[in-house]
Amino acid sequence: GDAWKPRQRTSEGKYVAATPERAAGTRKALGAIIDAGLAFVNHVAPFLCEPAVLDPAFQARFKAQMLDALVFAGLVGKFGANDSKFVGLTHTNLQLDNAYFWTADDGSLECGLLDWYMCSRTAMAQVWLGCLSGADGECLAGHDLAIFRAFSDEHEAFGGPRVPPEELLERFTLNFPSYIIGNISKIETHILSEVPAEKWKGLASKDDVLDGPWNARCFSLMIANGLSYWYHKGDDHPGAVMLRWAAKHDLVVGDAV
């Protein structure tokens, strides 16, 4: 095996010189994943997406924008936790059966956790990706900043530091390309493994999917909602936000691969 082969040796000069090759390899691998996602919505479950998302011109732009953005994804991961204002106690799988909500006699609402697994200090923006994963793409595109303003107001009202909503939205958006690629990568293992391609032919609407198995339902709708959100953000799509962020911090491709 590889363990018995001579160890590969490198140097700073060789590493820098190989950057274009690594970047090209990364784009090729990610491009194949994106193609698989587009093939899924085009040929297996087109009813999940609005016509504008299925337009070949949009899909070509989306793929190019994703590839330009994803090269900086690793740096975004480090950026996400670089300021304690944007890190808090979170639960990354807080389904309704993991918590309780009880209205007391005086009308106040008491809330708490029943299942503390996956409860930890985490970058808020990354958790928001899951919180809003079921939101209709067009609706989310029109109200994302308002949602983060409401959260920021409540966070401060209950004793937390002021979380600038515009910055929280930026951090949320910077994580979006990785979020989409992560969902697409689950097509074979989580979607088609539960509902094979031939069974999708018997479905006609999102309502049919909502009655289906958990993983197939969640990941297929997250892919569709993510594509819709990207489309409805227009020129302010996540790829553009990523490139503006990279330029603001003087980042180049060589910093990220």
Model-predicted segments: where are they?
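Conserved catalytic-loop position in the HRD/HxD motif
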Residues: 93, 115
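ATP-dependent phospho-/nucleotidyl transfer catalytic cores
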Residues: 1-91, 102-106, 218, 222, ...
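Conserved protein kinase catalytic/activation segment
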Residues: 98-112
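Short secondary-structure subsegments characteristic of cysteine-rich extracellular domains
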Residues: 167-176
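Surface-exposed helix-capping loop/turn segments at secondary-structure junctions
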Residues: 1-8, 155-165
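Catalytic loop of the DD-peptidase/beta-lactamase superfamily, centered on the K-T-G motif
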Residues: 213, 217
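Catalytic and GAP-homology cores of small GTPase regulators
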Residues: 94, 98-99, 122
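Active-site activation/catalytic loop segments of kinase-like enzymes and analogous catalytic loops
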Residues: 118-160, 177-202, 219-229, 233
